[in-house]
Amino acid sequence: GWLTEFLPDETVLDYIEQADQILVKFGATTERFQPSNELKKRCLEYDLHMSQAQLKHLGTDSNFETMKKLIHALAERVEIHTGADVVGVDRESHILTVKTAEGEQAVEAGKIIFAVGRAGSRFFSAWCEENDIPLHNNQVDVGVRVELPSMVWEDFAKKIYEPKIRYRSKGYGDIIRMFCFNDRGQVVTENTNGVLTVNGHAYRDEARKTQNSNF
């Protein structure tokens, strides 16, 4: 993301640490992978540029359990409604129109936070246009999911877990990068409102690991 364009680096790192402490409180791992100058140097020998950062591997399965505990804790203090679509937001009155299986209902809120994700991007874009809020498009990357035998990435997975590597193509100067690495994970198809995409999952449970890694 581009959060550091709006906040100082130190503030962003502080928020990341706060978020991590919350996740750990609800069962997330405390293990951190440290940067490796050795692997960075190996990449540079082939004109590959690897980002350096502390990383954690939560795991799809382990993260699901962490989220369940977090939601149960939140439910003791706030109301959580699922299976409900927000179909309208009045900017002046702060009244939301929510559609459920029983029909539409109005909900008034002091403050409203839009967190629409990919599935709600069209709704949010239309709402911004209706309320004369200017929009601009971010860069869109064209991606493929690559799967290789896990032994190819074994050194990286054991030392830093997730390599984030960039390469500038010689022909056209395009930036090619890898991200969302899954050590001995699974490649899956996801359907978001009829749009099919390919994603990867990695698990902490050894029994669910495969012989391949993907990114």
Each language-model region and where it sits:
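Active-site-adjacent segment of FAD-dependent monooxygenases/related oxidoreductases
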Residues: 24-31
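Residues forming the flavin
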Residues: 1-11, 31-215
